[in-house]
A protein has these predicted regions:
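Conserved, single-site charged/polar hotspot
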Residues: 2-503
Length: 503
């Protein structure tokens, strides 16, 4: 591992040298778009859901929410009162908001199987079993506690985490002037379709009173319609079909894995967000190719035994893929994103463009793919004063004037896992991919080397994103070379099972 990391560091460091020539000129090979609709191998069926599930997506907040409505519509309030209205639009604003109820739990153990959770609990009759998520997971817990601090202070030898869970949303009264009425929160709006902030939505809209933001707007819809609204925002619809299929399966897997489970979602009246904290969703689109790839992979997810794969993805890995161990996925291994079985070495990384890597394609690749390939190698100049300001504003830490930085830990892929920032008033250590990148000026990735130049740090690195899971540019180039989506997925996620969990 140390030797591999050393190779990566040397390779990135040599990006400082002048132009490097490989000597031989390679024959230009044109790419072809692969549109094969052949059947996938090794798919099993496991009826996790008797029918296609629904998902609730948080899409808006504010003191006033305006929704365009299309077709015959109906609104139902929290007490069951129904009002019909014709298309046009409605405006919702809060009249009265009452406090929501959040309870806090100490998590002792987690199970995928309900029967195993029940057996475990038999030895602890005072414990509770919490069922969470669209794809349910069962948590044996102690509680509830009224205050988070109480749960945090509670000591137990098997304590895994503290969950803050929404027991009852804020309620109150909501005004809709177009209907000349006031209704009890939450309200459910049913129409043929909706418009909100220049996007079109299917399913139904839910509006909740909320004591912090005033209102929360939630789009509740069928799961496959949700995936159709995710894929074109996470991967260009111009990408090859097999790459888009891989993206659809990854997006479906990721959503089911985190929906209603990810810690910051437990306090909300929805399953997932519409931004990058889960995955980007912008509602209904008119891309036929997206509809086709989602429908052709309907219900398909990646699983390892009874659990979902860690189906994360990102734009470009810089030629080096991160392992998934720290996220709990041992199938995802650190390796080169190359077409041969190659060890990462100085020969691969000392030039700015190397077509040995899937994420560094030839110039003849489609323009949209070369756009993503542009982050294969990058450079950024950040002032020491800017780093100090980031620490003060975003980390609530003041170490005075920043003088230098020092890398304390790298992963096997070469990514920085821990950095020490040195100032006139002290030192501060930052851990983790996202926080390291954020603290040093929002770097594209943590795969970098640097040098100090006066009052600046010059970073030179590779890739865009965390590096765990599927490299989207690499997936596109593999598809252009004829790879099928199942092969793309197994390269990036390991020996996963492709399982259809509903018809």
């Amino acid at each position: 591992m140390r030797l591999r990391t050393r190779f990566i560091l040397i390779g990135l460091a040599l990006l400082y040298v002048s132009c490097f020539s490989t000597g031989k000129r390679r024959e230009k090979v044109e790419f072809e778009r692969v549109e094969d609709e052949g059947k996938v191998n090794y798919v099993e069926f496991k009826e996790v859901f008797p029918e296609e599930p629904e998902i609730k997506v948080g899409i808006g907040r504010g003191r006033e929410i305006k929704i365009k409505t299309f077709g015959k519509c109906e609104v139902v309030d929290g007490e069951g009162k129904k009002l019909g209205f014709s298309e046009g639009g409605i405006t919702v604003s809060p009249v009265e908001i009452r406090k929501k109820l959040i309870k806090h739990w100490v998590i002792i153990e987690r199970f995928l199987d309900r029967e195993k959770a029940i057996v475990y609990k038999m030895a602890y009759p005072d414990y509770q079993i919490l069922k969470l998520g669209i794809y349910p997971r069962y948590f044996v817990a102690i509680g509830p506690f009224d205050k988070f601090e109480e749960a945090l202070r509670f000591k137990h030898p098997n304590k895994k985490a503290v969950f803050s869970i929404l027991e009852k949303p804020s309620d109150g009264k909501l005004r809709i002037p177009e209907l000349k009425t006031t209704l009890i929160s939450p309200i459910e709006i049913l129409c043929d379709s909706f418009g909100y902030k220049n996007n079109k939505y299917l399913g139904k809209m839910l509006v909740f009173a909320d004591e912090e933001s005033g209102l929360i707007l939630v789009n509740s819809l069928k799961f496959e319609d949700y995936i159709k609204g995710v894929v074109p925002w996470e991967m260009s619809a111009s990408y090859p079909v097999e790459a888009l299929k891989a993206q659809a399966i990854a997006a479906r897997t990721h959503a089911l894995d985190v929906a209603g489970i990810k810690w910051h979602l437990l306090k909300e009246p929805y399953d997932v967000t519409n931004d990058f904290t889960t995955q980007v969703y912008r509602g209904f689109t008119n891309y036929r190719v997206i509809d086709s790839v989602v429908e052709s992979t309907r219900g398909l997810v990646m699983m390892s035994g009874d659990r979902f794969s860690i189906a994360t993805f990102f734009m470009n890995c810089g030629g080096s893929l991160e392992g998934g161990e720290e996220w709990g996925d041992t199938l995802i291994k650190p390796k080169a994103d190359a077409f041969q079985d190659l060890e990462l070495s100085v020969e691969m990384l000392k030039i700015k463009k190397d077509t040995s890597f899937a994420c560094s394609p030839r110039d003849s690749a489609p323009r949209i793919i070369n756009y993503g390939a542009g982050s294969f190698r990058w450079e950024k100049k950040v002032s020491l004063s800017e780093i100090g300001e980031i620490l003060r504003k975003e980390f609530n830490v003041d170490i005075g004037m920043v003088k230098d930085i020092k890398v304390l830990k790298r992963s096997a892929s070469g990514r920085v896992k821990e950095v020490e920032i040195i100032g006139t008033k002290g030192k501060y250590r930052v851990k983790g991919d996202w926080d390291v990148r954020r603290s040093l000026g929002n770097l594209k990735s943590s795969l970098f080397v640097f040098k100090k130049s006066g009052n600046f740090i010059i970073f030179r690195g590779g890739g865009w994103g965390h590096g765990i899971g599927m490299c989207q540019v690499g997936a596109a180039v593999r598809a252009l070379k004829g790879w099928k989506y199942e092969d793309i997925l197994r390269f990036y996620y390991g020996n996963v099972d492709l399982v259809r969990i509903y018809r």
